[in-house]
Amino acid sequence: MTDLDLCAAQYSAIAGDLDANLQRHLQVMRLAAEQRIDFLLFPELSLTGYEPSLARELAQATDTALLQPVRTLAKQLRMTTVVGLPLRTAESDAILIGSALCGADGSQAIYTKQHLHAGEERVFSPGTGGAPLHLGDERIALSICADFTHASHARAAVERGAGIYATSVLISENGYPHDSELLEGYARELSLGVLMANHGGPSGGWSCAGRSAFWAPGGRQVVSAVGTGDCLVIARRRQGIWQGQTLELSLDN
């Protein structure tokens, strides 16, 4: 089993400010690369904040030039990076909650949220998911928030050969106990490594819980952020054993 370094970027988005969030994402990427991270995961809609009322205005095409700096830096740093943003499809006027996967090899793939929370359907349409990504000899399946509330979604990841389940979320203080129990259960029952990246501060009127985390296959919580705030939550696999650390971040405004 090869060494692997995963990181959840717990991040506090600036509401609706794509340019400012993009620059801060690049800053987080550079800081993560200093820790020799292989795979960096940002929260749900990290480039805009969770702002449904602004989503139609902020939605980007899947081939948007906005992501070019992320793609370029991911390749330069040799660090596969997943960022969140609202997406507009070429086929329709539908707005999707998306993740853009910028590979260490310069490639890009798109994952779109398949399962919506109650009320999200007023703005967003269900997406179609996406294929697991290959990282060395590991397969990583992506998820966006409500996707993981459907056990069939996690089981499908395992059936497609994934050993890591990486979910970009917005989880509130009230929702955290239930949601973290679900994720721990997938790690325990499906022998998945589960990486969860949550918002580090309020977004879209929600009081986010922070506490981004990683659970090793078997269900042991390896590492968790203490609470809210911007930080890196790192899980490292060495000779099959997982260890964790957290690093607080002080980002430029």
Task: Name what the model sees in each region.
Residues 2-8:
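Extreme N-terminal starter segment of soluble prokaryotic enzymes
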Residues 20-29, 148-155:
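Short, acidic/polar
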